[in-house]
Amino acid sequence: MAAQCESIGGDMNQSDPGSNSERSADSPVPGSEDDSPHDPEWREERFRVDRKKLETMLQAAAEGKGKSGEDFFQKIMEETNTQIAWPSKLKIGAKSKKDPHIKVSGKKENVKEAKERIMSVLDTKSNRVTLKMDVLHTEHSHVIGKGGNNIKKVMEETGCHIHFPDSNRNNQAEKSNQVSIAGQPAGVESARVRIRELLPLVLMFELPIAGILQPIPDPNSPTIQQISQTYNLTVSFKQRSRVYGATVIVRGSQNNTSAVKEGTAMLLEHLAGSLATAIPVSTQLDIAAQHHLFMMGRNGCNIKHIMQRTGAQIHFPDPNNPLKKSTVYLQGTIDSVCLARQYLMGCLPLVLMFDMKEEIEIEPQCITQLMEQLDVFISIKPKPKQPSKSVIVKSVERNALNMYEARKCLLGLDSSGVTVTNQSTLSCPVPMNCHGLDILAAGLGLSGLGLLGPNTLSVNSTTAQNSLLNALNSSLSPLHSPSSAAPSPTLWAASLANNATGFSAIPHLMIPSAAQATLTNFLLSGVPNYGQNTPSPPPGLTPVDVHMNGIHSECKKVTSALNGHVKPTNMKYGTISSSSLGDKVLNTNLAEASRQSNNHSSAEEVNSKTDPEGCNDAFVEVGMPRSPSHSANTKDLKQMLNSTKAPCPTRQTVKLLHGTKNSHLHGERLLSDSEMSPMEGPVTDKKAPGSERAAERAAAQQNSERARLTSQSEYGTMQAYDYEQKKLLATKAMLKKPVVTEVRTPTNTWSGLGFSKSTPAETIKELRRANHVPYKPTMTTTYENSSLSRSNSREQLGNGSDSENWRERNGIDSSQNDYSSSIGSPKRKQNKSAEHYLSSSNYMDCISSLTGSNGCNLNSSFKGSDLPELFSKLGLGKYTDIFQQQEIDLQTFLTLTDQDLKELGISTFGARRKMLLAISELNKNRRKLFEPTNIRASFLEGGASGRLPRQYHTDIASVSGRW
């Protein structure tokens, strides 16, 4: 390798008079250096000039076609009264790419003038950059090639100087992975892409064990040789120790990825036959250990996104393992492994360095805005003893174009010098529409490391809305089907609505208001049959305009602002509210299914309607199998189910598809089938979805029968019930004392909902994570999350036996409650201009300005006499188990203080505040009820308890807890 590097660098280690000497033997001697050493105005300045320009000047003089270097510098010395030392014997055509130095001596003003005149002709730094990328040291020789042929060709074609670290030759302990590329921006970016394409691509898979006597396949067999030659591959076999079978290793090049994948598939089919589709393919990616946490992202969100997007499994090594602490393992199908590998390489760090003139001043807030918009880190420092500044721009490889965009904005250039054609799909596998800034990915790469590439969705894109939605659909991953090659648009819409912050598992996604409105317009313009009576967003967020008017002008404003030509006056950043975006991105098929369902059953009405009070709720309808329940008193359960009905007769239904056939029972028919007569049984309609059903509609005149009608569409039957109320029912069923005379029959009514308290939630979570490397976050967050800290173990007990499992399987993220809380009630719509909301995920805090000074408007109409029901209505159901374990009932709860709640383990301030407000309100109501004029039968029967107001829907009031 040393010989290769010497041949690459040419005269890099030799003393080149043109690059290493300040002046040559025949250079003019600055006599004034010795004459006036103590002159306070005397100054010396040393700077580089462009080697090619100086060579051209000397060559032209030798051919008699122009002014010689001697004449050029002599004239400047005479006119500026300075002494100039320059390399007059510069070797023309040398392999060295280093720029030579010029030294000017004289008075300060004269030196400045002389330098300006020299640089006006021989300037080297005006358009020269240095890029440092990460290439594993073991792959340097593969990139360099035999005799340096590979890298020489890259340097010649791109006009760049590429330097590999010399320290790797002697230092066996510490190896450097950094490769430096110097040259023009377009050439530097092209060289980076070419280096990535020269990297080797190795895929491996295990041959199934067919028998003891089965020999290892011969790599020289005609079939294997034919595959190797056709697809330019190298195939080898490795015997596994102490077991029968072999590992097949397929080697190719990154610039031949399609052939490597096709050849591996052919080889797999040849060797494994019908088992080829069941055999996973694996590969390894060596990444420096110091980059692992950065690439994994906050709480591992980046790796989770890559696995969900590609379907591949990614395993990072144990940092304490000294042997293979840098090796990352990928496993899955051939396509998923290659795609995941490209995504990971797109997350490798990049450093772009260039010089800026000393007189250029940039305000810190402009730099901050650039960093936020372009998702880069910018550092500007003055150079010691040089009249210039050094600028360092850091980001990741998938965001390389924005690094050059930042340089263009900082230097005030007309163009970044890099076009989209220079960008490789290796670092950005998602198809690119045009050169622009992805407003979705802004702010993700360095903080959360999301998956959206820098050109997935461009602001100034002029493609049709359908193409835009398809691009978004391909760039966002479904949460439920990581192995699916084509993600379902419905699943994508569900995952988009999962977080109040905008996208699932991406914390703190901040985008400009104008960009948010533009994105929303693009998304909603392609959604058919969309109602105009959608819930308004909470105050402080950009209101959504569902029309397409003015989109092109808005795009131009955003694009120009991001390019730095127009400085936005009041650019405010706000999180994407799921109430204004997520719940609106409904798929065409989903809307069609909704229309069909509306034709068959008025109880399953899904069209967006508004009652006289303006109520417009989102009722999640998820199909789950149910059986008769005998776990609790049937009458009590039915009464509780009836109490969960919304005051509004109509609801907007969002259906999340579940891949299994479901029971025909609906929410209000959860109870025993024995209560149903044969005439009341579910009606099965086996006609085609589009056929006429007038006879059925005429027969189903009563509401109870219409409620049981099901639509036999391609999605299967659906059921409507409220998860929050089911958890309350499960709690009541578990608290119910066994009756000796009553036969208790086990049922699977609650199966899969995660309500069981038989096993701690954390134990199940650890078992499910057994095959994954645990990722411990290095920074704690302030929001509630039961898995963030072991110190919250008492709160974790309230989660039951891994309550998240039901939500994860059915496409409802644990923060779906935050989404529900942002749906506006009529009162919030009327007062949204005057309200001040503390938190969109804490409903009781949000409505404090509506309900009075204490923020908890509980009145005496509250019929519940136990703590679980109160907590459920307040959205604090996750804390029910803590109070039950401490044997605290409602009466004792009313005597608790803030310190008592802390000692119980309620560490979250928002939850304690809601409890204290409820205690205060209930105590106040109890004092009123003790007055003789206010004593009522409900008080005597149910105890001193308050009530929740009627105007606040229970779906909204119980949404802040995370299960």
UniProtKB/Swiss-Prot annotation:
Residues 128-195, 280-344 form the KH domain. Residues 35-48, 602-612, 683-696 have a biased composition (Basic and acidic residues). Putative RNA-binding protein. May be involved in regulating gene expression during embryonic development. Seems to be involved in endoderm formation. Ectopic expression results in endoderm formation in the absence of mesoderm induction. GO terms for cellular component: cytoplasm. PROSITE patterns: KH_TYPE_1, SAM_DOMAIN. It comes from the Eukaryota. Residues 1-48, 592-613, 668-713, 767-834 are annotated as: Disordered. One of its GO terms (molecular function) is RNA binding. Residues 12-22, 592-601, 812-824 have a biased composition (Polar residues). Residues 784-797 have a biased composition (Low complexity). It comes from Xenopus laevis. Residues 862-925 form the SAM domain. Pfam families: KH_1, KH_BICC1, KH_BICC1_1st, SAM_1. Keywords: Developmental protein, Repeat, RNA-binding. Belongs to the BicC family. This is Protein bicaudal C homolog 1-A.
